[in-house]
């Protein structure tokens, strides 16, 4: 089962052009480092679970949760010692996506650079494919 939500803003971004890849999800070094930092304080959890939820003005929004186990239908991505699980409902939506972690003076958030997104809302929190 999944546990509490990860305390970070999740933003969908479609402006960046990515090279096609067969990987369901790739992580930037910044995302890997942040996930390691988050999990360091949660030794009972094995990784993060990424999902999509129906919400927002554009239809879909990403969700991130700590997880203690891999679900039967989850796809597992292991990169640089970090485990990220993708819920079945999100697998096709995330195909070829790069997960990044960005910090500036005003905010810090995970950013999904997703080549499949056809549009986002003004704030970038929700999207459609």
Curated annotation (Swiss-Prot):
One of its GO terms (biological process) is iron-sulfur cluster assembly. It is found in: Mitochondrion. Fe cation binds at residues 57, 121, 123. Its main location: mitochondrion. Residues 1-12 form a transit peptide. One of its GO terms (molecular function) is iron-sulfur cluster binding. GO terms for cellular component: mitochondrion. Keywords: Iron, Iron-sulfur, Metal-binding, Mitochondrion, Transit peptide. Involved in the maturation of mitochondrial 4Fe-4S proteins functioning late in the iron-sulfur cluster assembly pathway. Probably involved in the binding of an intermediate of Fe/S cluster assembly. Interacts with CRY2, but not with CRY1 (in vitro). Belongs to the HesB/IscA family. This is Iron-sulfur cluster assembly 1 homolog, mitochondrial. The gene is Isca1.
